[in-house]
Amino acid sequence: MAKLTVVYWRDIPAQVIVKAGRQTAKRQLTERFEKAIDRAAMRAKLRDTDSYLAEWRRSDPADCGDDLEAVATAEAERLEAAYDEARLAALVASGGVDSV
């Protein structure tokens, strides 16, 4: 059974990983997520490397379909739609922490 994992910086998603055995499909989210993470880190005053790196986490692996590429693409598209500019701006304003 394949497993789906999302990599986050605090509560901002950055990457989707789908893995089954030795096979892996990965999708990095678009540049707007990377920019939001950088802005949120600056707002949270996490300027040194160790503080910044300590905030990365992975979601618990979730069971998913066996077409790794399709699952990775679908989840990346879902996250792109779920995190519109307003939601990312709110996350930046809160230092990357989702207040919902």
Q: What does each of the following model-derived ranges do?
A:
Residues M1-R27:
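Short, charged/polar N-terminal "headpieces" of proteins
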Residues R10, V16, F33, I37, ...:
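Solvent-exposed, flexible loop/coil residues
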Residues G21-R58:
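Acidic, aromatic-enriched beta-alpha/helix-loop junctions
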Residues A54-T73:
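Mid-chain, well-packed structural core segment of small domains
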Residues A70-V100:
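C-terminal charged interaction modules
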